[in-house]
């Protein structure tokens, strides 16, 4: 659930995210400010209002490039944990504030009908900083600090 309000070249989006995890759910409030310029820089701040009781920040850039009838969007981001225990703990088993991950991605949006799109994405993500590496390797299914993954979303805008 989110709402976006354009303010000149800046768009401000706020919303609520519900995460449905095995063994426990959590929810976050978030706000993102994005600037419509070269590389489209954005800053997102998340605050876990349930299980994590902490925050998370993401600084990102992205650029769309025409590719036939579609466009491909290349992106990069850096995540910074702000004592959010839902993101994992450091080697001492404590929440931490510090670098968490870096990610590069490639995505597109394929119109299906009306305001509905199919949005595939691939990405490579790796832990940054020793605390981030400790947290990510502890909660990852394979104990590794990096992952290559893909996703597909169906989006309806109204």
Residue ranges and their predicted role:
Residues 1-5, 16, 31-35, 45, ...:
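Residues on the lipid-exposed face of transmembrane beta-strands in outer-membrane beta-barrel proteins
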Residues 104, 109-158:
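Predominantly the C-terminal beta-signal and adjacent terminal strand-loop region
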Residues 12, 23-26, 52-54, 83-87, ...:
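Outer-membrane beta-barrel proteins
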Residues 64, 73-97, 101:
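A mid-sequence, solvent-exposed acidic-amphipathic segment
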């Amino acid at each position: 659930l989110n709402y976006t309000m354009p303010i000149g070249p800046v768009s401000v989006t706020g919303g609520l995210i519900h995460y449905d995890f095995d063994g426990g759910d959590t929810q976050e409030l978030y706000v993102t400010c994005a600037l419509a310029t070269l590389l489209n820089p954005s800053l997102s701040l998340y605050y876990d209002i349930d299980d994590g009781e902490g925050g998370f920040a993401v600084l990102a850039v992205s650029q769309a490039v025409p590719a036939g009838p579609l466009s491909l969007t290349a992106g990069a981001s850096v995540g910074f944990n702000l004592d959010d225990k839902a993101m994992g703990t450091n080697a001492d088993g404590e929440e931490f504030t510090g670098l968490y991950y870096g990610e590069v991605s490639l995505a597109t949006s394929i119109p299906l009908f009306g305001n509905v799109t199919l949005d595939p994405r691939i990405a490579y993500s790796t832990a940054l900083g020793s605390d981030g590496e400790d947290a990510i390797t502890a909660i990852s299914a394979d104990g590794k600090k990096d992952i290559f993954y893909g996703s597909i979303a169906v989006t309806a805008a109204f």
